[in-house]
């Protein structure tokens, strides 16, 4: 038998070492140093000393698991959730909120400085409630044959297994209180073994639920779901596949308010998870853009108008460009019901060649963009060609924000302000926004 060897394979030295963390990374892992190498340790806070065991070793860094904590940081707090440490939803409930925000802001500042050479402050942080903030969640469903029970919950940390969730303090209370009765309802269905997942969403006009089912539901099951809907005042939608949606109720369309405007959305549409931070984020963008009645504004990756509509109330015209057709349709509808006839929405793929797209032939003096995690490298050169006075970049990935910032800086723009958005407390997610000006 031929055997193959990898000469570059690094053997992990699994003996126990003692380290002291001096920092946190964005994921909430303790950052320590040992013999010149950076060691990342989940569960360790700055100032804490611990015995750890290496689990992965690279040339420049290593990962380790906590064996025994030898001291406690004053920033260590008791997690509110009984599932913390097993559930993969939150990683930082053991960390005082002030330290969470400080660490994320420092990571953002470091990434921008490393990529652009510019020193910025990402504070003051835009923040909201530490718990009870999440107005949208997707829960997995798995039928356990031996236990004859459907598990409803989130994925375990670093695993595909589900944690049965009975409570979740980061959810809005209106959604958290649905968890146990929803579990009872779904376990009573004939189709209990053929359910995929469930999404809970809190609109301003009430909660809604989307149930993904793998086989057509019997009338008896629909009646049980209808009873659940009435008893708990929740709109129920059934999804037989990834595109179809059947409403069990004759209830009004879901909507939320931003900047005093009503935005109607489809149950599956993307909306910002944290309402309070979203309100502040929109207000900050409007302030930074210094909007005037004669402005012509471009809103890229605009969704259904979360920024577009509030901007449209102030300026001469605004064009929103979005790649998802349903979001564009909802944006157009929202502009109509809010009597904003100076807003245009374009359905275009911003990851394709944009130069032949109709909006690209127009002139704008101010630009806002809110791309997905991949960033906006495909449109940055065109933004530079527009020569706008101000650019506001909203980001869910600090790495791509830092990368794309470089293009604006090389074109003569300056970073005027940066803010870290604490959109997802107790998690490693880092949202931010930046203002650029010529």
From Swiss-Prot:
InterPro entries per UniProt: 23S_rRNA_MeTrfase_RlmD (IPR001566), MeTrfase_TrmA_AS (IPR030390), MeTrfase_TrmA_CS (IPR030391), NA-bd_OB-fold (IPR012340), SAM-dependent_MTases_sf (IPR029063), TRAM_dom (IPR002792), U5_MeTrfase_fam (IPR010280)
TM regions (residue ranges): none
Occurrences of domain TRAM (ranges): 9-68
SUPFAM superfamilies: Nucleic acid-binding proteins (SSF50249), S-adenosyl-L-methionine-dependent methyltransferases (SSF53335)
Enzyme Commission numbers on file: 2.1.1.190
Biological process per Gene Ontology, one example term: rRNA base methylation
Keyword Iron: yes
Sequence positions that bind S-adenosyl-L-methionine: 272, 301, 306, 322, 349, 370
Summary of the function given for this chain in its UniProt record: Catalyzes the formation of 5-methyl-uridine at position 1939 (m5U1939) in 23S rRNA.
The name this protein goes by in its record: 23S rRNA (uracil(1939)-C(5))-methyltransferase RlmD
Gene name of the record: rlmD
